Amino acid sequence: MPDELRAEKSFPSKPYDSLKNKSEFDRVYQKGFKKHNPFFSLFVLDLSKEPPKEKEGFKDPLSCRLKDKKTLYLLGLSVSKKVGNAVKRNLIKRRLRSLTLKHAALCQGLALVFVPRSDCYHLDFWALEKHFLEMLTSIKNYMNKALKGLKKGITHTYAKQ
């Protein structure tokens, strides 16, 4: 096929990569910070502050994927069948992906996992965005507070080592 007839890419590449397997989700659940509201739970792991774990020839998959210049953050969506049928679940996933794309600068260097609840479907996009921004800024403030405590040598209940 001649080069003149080839279509150019019409969509820009997405700034996130998805969490792929159970071990990646479990790492965010166990080591990350979490926040809950009646509509969804948000788990956040700051990968920029965490040193990559390297064993014999094994590289940390989460940290390595962020070193790629096109990938700003990692996103995981865990939508249960209790939330609704496939149409409802997919609508929620599209909205959450769109939210993270819209606020990609806030999500930079993070691994995010969303766990929506059944009431999440009844929210419109703007209400969902409001709850997402409140939770994300609260978690980021919490993480900064914990990091400052660790630098000073103070171990609080919110500071993870």
UniProtKB/Swiss-Prot annotation:
CC annotations in GO: ribonuclease P complex
UniProt entry keywords in alphabetical sequence: Endonuclease, Hydrolase, Nuclease, RNA-binding, tRNA processing
Organism placement in taxonomy: Bacteria, Pseudomonadati, Campylobacterota, Epsilonproteobacteria, Campylobacterales
Biological process according to GO: tRNA 5'-leader removal
Assembly and interaction partners: Consists of a catalytic RNA component (M1 or rnpB) and a protein subunit.
Entry's transmembrane regions: none
Gene encoding the protein: rnpA
Family under the similarity heading: Belongs to the RnpA family.
Name of the protein described by the UniProt record: Ribonuclease P protein component
